[in-house]
Amino acid sequence: MRGKLRRGGRGRLAPQQIGVKLAIPFVGEISGVWEPVEAEREAAWELYVELATRISVVELGEDEGLLREALSSLYTVFGTTREILRRYGPAVAPRVAPGQVTFGLLAVNVLNLSIRPLLSRWHPLLTAYEVQREDRVDPVAHERSWDRAPELRAEIESVRQVLLALAQALNKVAGVGDLITVDVPAQTREPGRA
């Protein structure tokens, strides 16, 4: 994603235009030029914060987290995105020329082509497996013993990559610092302190 930058409102760098490319597994690519208006910048910030603070853009290691939590987080992203679209209305989804994209176009397509298929397939399958758990079996151990867990983890990772690419575009449009891949410097201990 490259963009021409200008100083925007509130002292941040806001792009006049960026190139966007999102690879949607099993569907293809959504790409184009985004020339955001102020409402799109504000909506981009809101959705960026949502994505940056959810497990949906953080890699889910093989022995980390619960699949149910990951699906629930993605479900919440769905609702929040719809809420943002309603709040900003048509201003974030204007008609544009072929080859151009808008906040609305990107958001709705990521929901419908990436998140929705994952949730509609895996939510009922995981629920059916969860109800088989005996009371004496730990929910974490039960979920990790599911033979389809690696397959679901792989699909969650595919969606995560789409959401990460979307978050990067939102970050540029909002004109803010990267809140997802922040490098934290190593902490040094002072002599004599624990």
Regions found by a protein language model. Give the residues of each.
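Alpha-helical oligomerization segments
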Residues: 135-194
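Short, charged/polar, low-complexity loop and linker segments
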Residues: 54-58, 83-105, 134-151
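Membrane-proximal, non-transmembrane interface segments of integral membrane proteins
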Residues: 3-77
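Generic structural signal for well-ordered, non-transmembrane alpha-helical segments
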Residues: 68, 72-75, 79, 109, ...
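Charged/polar positions within long, soluble alpha-helices
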Residues: 79-86, 90, 116-127, 131, ...
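Extended amphipathic alpha-helical regions
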Residues: 101-139
